Amino acid sequence: MENYRQIDLSAWTKFGEGGNGVTYVSLDEPDVILKINKPGLCTLEFVKHEYDVSKAVERLGIPVPKVYEIVRVGDDYATISERVKSKKSLSRICCDEPALTEAMAEVLCEHGKKLFSAQCDTQIFPSRKAQLTRALEKVRFISKKNRRILKEFARTIEDKTTCVHGDFQTGNIIRSGESYFWIDLDRFGYGDPMFDIGHLFLICNVYAPMKQVQDIFHMGEAQLRSFWVAFARAYTGEEDCSAFDHLAGKFACLDIVLRYEFQKPSLAEKLFFAFHISHLIKRYYLG
């Protein structure tokens, strides 16, 4: 078994906190950050997956912070990565300067389109459509009719071989000077870009009224919805985005189904997912 360097956390200072974990900096190693995932995500299996994915994405030419090594912090596993100086996520920029919301939506659109046009390594990364096919067999508390509706739509999706992020949202692209970097790549894969866009739609519209979501993204409901409107207009080049919104709503439903591929939902989460799946099917598949 490989020996990993043991880190003394007392020599490090907490630097930031995100959805997956906490980052630390050290005066002794000023050009790197230590990232410790939250409980359940600090196993060697998960951290090595993050490490391997980051290295593979970098080889594709996608702008990401360099990851250097896997380390131990007590019994947990963590990573040492490049410290991107003076960084801010699009979420934080929108929070600090609400007047830039539309501009940041255009930034996400621009860099999203670059990502979606990049050819992925299909020998390393998973097909999002294949993941969806598996997840549709796992999803619970939905009717046979609704499962059939989703399967029929899933069969129409082209299995594209271009990149998708997997957690495409304002917190996962950071700015440093004039440069932008993608972060949190553990769900990276290939497929139709609408998988990523549906995820963004889910956050900015369906989940926007939730206080927990607002806290994560540092934006209130109205600002999240405004971000989506600006993104949709930038992405389509049109003022009337109703058809695009409708398609994104369909993929938002599939994004919830995909949770069964990416995690092991609790009973409460399964019921939460089922409620929103049913609501989205009524609105975007049957409406």
Task: Report each predicted region and the residues it spans.
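Short pocket-lining segment of the protein kinase catalytic domain that shapes the ATP-binding cleft
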Residues: 79-87
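Active-site activation/catalytic loop segments of kinase-like enzymes and analogous catalytic loops
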Residues: 197-238, 252-268
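Conserved kinase catalytic-core helix
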Residues: 60, 87-125
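ATP-binding glycine-rich phosphate-binding loop
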Residues: 4-27
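The N-lobe alphaC helix and its flanking beta3-alphaC-beta4 segment of protein kinase-like domains
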Residues: 44-60
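An alpha-helical support segment within catalytic cores of ATP-dependent transferases
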Residues: 1-5, 117-166, 170-171, 176, ...
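Short beta-strand micro-motifs within the conserved protein kinase catalytic domain, predominantly
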Residues: 66-77
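ATP-binding glycine-rich loop module of kinase domains
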Residues: 21-47
